[in-house]
Amino acid sequence: MEWKIERASVEGQRLAADIRLQAIVDGEAALPGSLRDAATVLGVQARAVPGAGETQGDKVVLSGQVLFDVLYAQGDLTRVQCIETACDFRQIADAPGVTPRMALAWDVCVEDAQARASGGRLMLTAALSLYAIVTADAAIEAVTDVTGDPALRTRCCRARLQRTTGRGEARALVREEFELPAALGVQDTLYATADARVDEVVGGEGRVTVSGTVELTVCHAGGESRPLVITRHSAPFEQSVALEAGEEDAVGASVRVLDVMADSMEAGEDARVLRTEVELLVRAQATHAAQRELLCDVYTTSGDLAEPARREERLMADGAGERARESGKIVLALPDDAPPVGTMLAAFVQPAAGTRERSGGRLRVDGMMGVTLVYLPIDSQVPVSTRQDAPMSVQFACGLSADAAIALECVEAVASAITSDRVEVRFILSLEGMDCGAQPLQVVTDVTRTPAQAEPGAIVVYYPAQDETAWDIAKRYRVDAQSLRALNPQLEEARAGEPVVVLRRGAAEA
């Protein structure tokens, strides 16, 4: 009998590379004060801004900037000053099989930042964690079924395939003003940081509207009793993005803070106004998910042998980005040589992710947390700082797997003195991650017929190996699965070491 092989073109996205990198960025900046005045670094915050990403022949090139905000005191040690500077980075990662114009998604975060003053200059260092996922559109000719002979036995499986059908991005500028009460004692605004999140994505017909919230943390210079003042503010944003999406496509969006500017000025008697400007990059993406019925395996119970030809493909199944937040707290004991706490001014937290484990619908992230405390000692108007590393373990409510690429940031940290040598730090961490969602799929590309050698009939007692299934046993001895279960009524699924009785073709039933 002639076999009829049914084929179909399967459209999906192939995972070309999943890259994880660590990098160190060094830089320096000149202090504006006199060389004769020693400078004391009180704290440093750094954030990484992704720039251009490019796929080339067997490699991926990632570039961007690290923005440093350094608090220091120089000359008048009771006065907190700030210097802002940027350092460029460029990383090249080997990626065999990658070609130009493949789709690239990547992100970067700062895991540690340090600053040291020497000879009128600041020496800056940042440790970066980068990840990149490269995909390519793939159209695969796959066998979906084989018919035409009653001796054929086929097993099909459902494959979930996901592919990106559209991308779009736009820049947004969020300007907002806030009142600063006179009770805060703000004299000047030093710098600001911002975190943005997406709250809603709506729209259609070629455009989507992305709305969300920008949260700002602003550092100000104050008076002698409180030389450093921290204020927090929030503002909404809304941005339209051009995006072509189908009716059955899922639409998602993400937002990245590119730049933050803040300044304050007097506005009448005992009043001050804070003016902020935040530049955002808003990205939208449409994805289409589909279930396809594909041939997984085939054999015959008589006649010619059926030999499936297979090819392994890593196709995207559930790849998606996700964002989550979680709060926590730690209690720190000051170092023995640190002066006792009088007035707590600020806390800066820099998380670094280590091991990850998924349990109970949550992703637990263990790692280290660099904590910088800025405070006024008892009976002193000169601010000091201490930096300590503390272990952390935070559980995020999200659907990311333990192998997902993640980036951690601290969006808020508040410190309060329990005693003169113990401080409680409450923090909120933001996790942004991406599951590549690739599944190794054995695609049957063809089925060939080969003559079968004559074999005598027999009754066989077979002991399955580990991970061997009833289908594997039936295929090995070219018997029907129903006859296998008829001889083994208790057989739900094969178990290693438990005997299975097989009536081989040609044996007569007693």
Sequence positions of predicted segments:
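Primarily a LysM-type cell-wall glycan-binding module
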Residues: 449-486, 491-510
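Membrane-lipid interaction segments
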Residues: 2-456
